[in-house]
């Protein structure tokens, strides 16, 4: 089993558990150049809030979009947008990635700005 297949199988297990519980989830996806975050409804049918390093306002704030600092900026933005929509608590879906580096920076920044996990 290669790395990608192992990550995808880990993410499937997490998503099945979260869907059974019906929690709104913060889903993180990363590429070498960008970080994406989405808040998805409990039944998995709609994206409620989204933010990424592809957006112009995020690109203006950071020098390079594929590092820890830019992931922290995305975390701040996603937390602020959740507050505007009235979402205060989410379950964290790390999509099979390790809780380290950019994923960790995004979540910690979201926590600091008032999003509860």
From Swiss-Prot:
Gene Ontology BP terms: translation
Oligomeric form and interacting partners: Part of the 50S ribosomal subunit; part of the 5S rRNA/L5/L18/L25 subcomplex. Contacts the 5S and 23S rRNAs.
MF (Gene Ontology): 5S rRNA binding; structural constituent of ribosome
The UniProt record lists the keyword Ubl conjugation: no
Protein name per Swiss-Prot or TrEMBL: Large ribosomal subunit protein uL18
UniProt KW Ribosomal protein keyword: yes
Gene Ontology annotations for the cellular component aspect, listed alphabetically: cytosolic large ribosomal subunit
Reported function: This is one of the proteins that bind and probably mediate the attachment of the 5S RNA into the large ribosomal subunit, where it forms part of the central protuberance.
Gene: rplR
Keywords: Ribonucleoprotein, Ribosomal protein, RNA-binding, rRNA-binding
Similarity comment text for this entry: Belongs to the universal ribosomal protein uL18 family.
């Amino acid at each position: 089993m290669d790395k990608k297949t192992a990550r995808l199988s880990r993410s499937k297990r997490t998503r099945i558990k979260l869907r059974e519980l019906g929690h709104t989830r913060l889903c993180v996806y990363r590429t070498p150049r960008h970080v994406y975050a989405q808040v998805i409804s409990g039944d998995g049918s709609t994206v409620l809030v989204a933010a990424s390093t592809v957006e112009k306002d995020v690109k203006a704030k950071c020098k390079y979009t594929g590092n820890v600092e830019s992931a922290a900026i995305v975390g701040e933005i996603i937390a602020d947008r959740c507050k505007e929509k009235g979402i205060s608590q989410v379950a964290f879906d790390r999509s099979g990635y390790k809780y380290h580096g950019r994923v960790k920076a995004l979540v910690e920044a979201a926590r600091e700005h008032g999003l509860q996990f």
